[in-house]
Each structure stands twice: as C-alpha cells, then as structure tokens.
Amino acid sequence: MNGTEGPNFYIPMSNKTGVVRSPFEYPQYYLAEPWKYSILAAYMFLLILLGFPINFMTLYVTIQHKKLRTPLNYILLNLAFANHFMVLCGFTITLYTSLHGYFVFGQSGCYFEGFFATLGGEIALWSLVALAIERYIVVCKPMSNFRFGENHAMMGVAFTWIMALACAVPPLFGWSRYIPEGMQCSCGVDYYTLKPEINNESFVIYMFVVHFLIPLIIITFCYGRLVCTVKEAAAQQQESATTQKAEKEVTRMVIIMVIFFLICWVPYAYVAFYIFCNQGSEFGPIFMTVPAFFAKSSAIYNPVIYIMLNKQFRNCMITTLCCGKNPFGDDDASSAATSKTEATSVSTSQVSPA
C-alpha cells in the first residue's frame, strides 16, 4: 500500500520512513512545504472575504425587495443560504486548520466540517436539479393547465434539503465516514479505503449514482429539451417577443450556473472516483487537495452569475447599496416595467398547450 491508514484517517504516503503522524495531532509538513499550506489559507481567506458579503447581500436584497420574492427565486435564495452556511461553518474552519498545517479540531471537528461541506455542495446540486425541472415545466409545457407557484417552489426547496441530508447524514451514523483529505486540512467522505466494517464501498457507489450521476442526467435531459423548445418557439413565433426574451434570459442564467457547477465539481468527483477505484495506488496529497479546494469556490459563483445576468436583481442590488437610490436611473420605478417580464411572467406563468 502506498498510503498509511489510521483509525480515523488515511495519509497518501507510505510510513516506511516512520514520519507519518496523525493529522489530528501533528502538522503535516512532511506532505507539503509550509508555504503551500499558507497558500491554502490565503485562498480560503479570499473565499470568505468574497463569499460572505456576496451571499449575505443576495439574501438581504431578496428579502428587502418584494418583487424579487418570486417562486423561481426561492430556489436561488435557498442556494445563497446554503452557500452562506458553507462559508460560516466550513470555510472558517478550513482557514484555521490550513494556518496550522493539520486538522487541529480533531475527529469531531472533521465530521462537523465534512458534513457542512457535503451538505452545501449537495444542496447546490439538487437546487440546480430543481431549477432545471422548473425551467422544463415552464418553457417546455409538458403538462397542460399547470401553474408553477409558491407551493411548488417551497416543495422544491424542501426536496433539495431532503436529498442533501440523505447524502451528508449517513457518514455521521456509521455508513461511511468523514476523514481529512489531501493535505489533511479539510474533510470529506472517505474515498480512500473500502472499510467493510462501515460499508464504505456501498456508500461511495450510492453517493456517485444517486447524488451525482442521476442529477446530471436529469439536468442534461431538462436543458436538452429546453434548448430545443426555445429554438422551435423562436422559429415559429408561438409566444410573444417579451415572453420569449424573458424565458431565454432566465434559461441562459441557469445554464451558465450549471456549467460553472460542473467546472467546479466534476474534477473533484473524477479524482475521488479514481482514488476509490484504484485502492492503494500512489498519488500525492496535491492530487486531491487542488480539486477539493477548487470545488469550494462554488459558494461564490452562483450569486455572482445571478447578479450579472439578472437585470432586475442587479438594479435592486445597486438601489440597496446606494441607500434606496439607483444612480444609473434604473431604480424601482423605472424597472417596474420589466419586473413582470424578467421575473413574474417567467416563474409563475400559466402553462397551457402550445
């Protein structure tokens, strides 16, 4: 074996030289130089510096402006809340452990950080699934006389949390476990060992199939059909120009969010699955650290994309930051005309046969 397995950890280095120590008790500078841990700490500080205000303002602006509280935005608000939770409960811990070069909070802290990192990532994934299904229902109209409203949005939010908890909770109760990964400063699901006494192999397979592959299949199907429907509607002029424009804008925003999610999480999923399928193979700590820390940036890009691509939300954000007055002239009064087109007509539109 090219790694060293302990009671609650796995170090990606053989202990033939006798230098391997518990990541809960000793600095792991034999895995990487101290300056590399400093880079990880600086990166986490940057994510906190950006992630906290961005997600907080997303929540605050949505609560402040009634016209933003539409069914579609419930899922986006849920996403911002989960990201905010990740920043406060996960990133701060990882920043502190990176500064010390090992996971100073012990096994309990590892379970705490691993749980919230997994929960936040899964809420983001299932939120994108809910958004894809909502877009598919509204734009593709698979059901006649169906109106997507507040109750459906709340059900979608509840669904994201149920599915995320179904992935993040089992390791807390003995089906798999959370252990330090990579350079041993952050924690995640144990992809490194089979660990039959905790049925680790079955959990990893369950996680990849149910909580990664199936969501991606649903998202791919929904947006594949959606793109075809939007093109057909544009060619046949079946809907008004304003409705088509609103649907295209919201659809573009969500598709970009999905693309960025894949950019952030697919490398991590690929590396984790590779390690799992090649038990005992040789790999350095950086091999898992880079995709794991890169995946954490997902807590920032979704609200940024939403602010950049949604004119109504952008105007509300500027109005809030400028104490109730938009210096660019697109304040609440001037944007009222576009409110229905960009939000209400898309998220709560009556779906009827074409």
UniProtKB/Swiss-Prot annotation:
Residues 62-73, 134-152, 225-252, 309-354 are cytoplasmic. Residues 332-354 are annotated as: Disordered. It comes from the Eukaryota. Keywords: Cell projection, Chromophore, Disulfide bond, G-protein coupled receptor, Glycoprotein, Lipoprotein, Membrane, Palmitate, Phosphoprotein, Photoreceptor protein, Receptor, Retinal protein, Sensory transduction, Transducer, Transmembrane, Transmembrane helix, Vision. The chain crosses the membrane at residues 37-61, 74-96, 111-133, 153-173, 203-224, 253-274, 287-308. Gene3D superfamilies: Rhodopsin 7-helix transmembrane proteins (1.20.1070.10). Contains one covalently linked retinal chromophore. Upon light absorption, the covalently bound 11-cis-retinal is converted to all-trans-retinal. After hydrolysis of the Schiff base and release of the covalently bound all-trans-retinal, active rhodopsin is regenerated by binding of a fresh molecule of 11-cis-retinal. A lipid is attached at C322, C323 (S-palmitoyl cysteine). Photoreceptor required for image-forming vision at low light intensity. Required for photoreceptor cell viability after birth. Light-induced isomerization of 11-cis to all-trans retinal triggers a conformational change that activates signaling via G-proteins. Subsequent receptor phosphorylation mediates displacement of the bound G-protein alpha subunit by arrestin and terminates signaling. Residues 334-354 have a biased composition (Low complexity). It holds the Pfam family Rhodopsin_N. The modification N6-(retinylidene)lysine is found at K296. It is found in: Membrane; Cell projection, Cilium, Photoreceptor outer segment. One of its GO terms (biological process) is G protein-coupled opsin signaling pathway. GO terms for cellular component: membrane; photoreceptor disc membrane; plasma membrane. It is a multi-pass membrane protein. Disulfide bonds join C110-C187. InterPro entries: GPCR_opsins, GPCR_Rhodpsn, GPCR_Rhodpsn_7TM, Opsin, Retinal_BS, Rhodopsin, Rhodopsin_N. This is Rhodopsin. Residues 1-36, 97-110, 174-202, 275-286 are extracellular. A motif ('Ionic lock' involved in activated form stabilization) lies at residues 134-136. Glycans are attached at N2, N15. One of its GO terms (molecular function) is 11-cis retinal binding. The gene is RHO.
